[in-house]
């Protein structure tokens, strides 16, 4: 995932959720993913999937059972 893609996805998240709180950071361990933050809180990872020339991005968010206690 390159910096242009990260900027575009970051803008997409902020526009879709009507905020400026989203930030994407390149995942240092995997060049095909980026970390997604909302107001400095880690939300999950977004992965680039390039299959048969079609590019898609998949967002993965893990919710721990203990996180649901405050919901």
Can you say where each PLM-predicted feature lies in the sequence?
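Terminal leader/tail segments of proteins
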Residues: 1-71
């Amino acid at each position: 995932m390159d910096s242009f893609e990260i900027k575009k996805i970051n803008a997409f998240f902020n526009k879709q959720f009507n905020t400026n709180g989203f930030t994407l950071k390149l995942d240092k361990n995997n060049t095909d993913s980026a970390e997604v933050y909302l107001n400095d809180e880690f939300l999950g990872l977004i992965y680039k999937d390039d299959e048969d020339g079609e590019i898609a991005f998949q967002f993965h968010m893990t919710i721990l059972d203990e996180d649901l206690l405050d919901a």
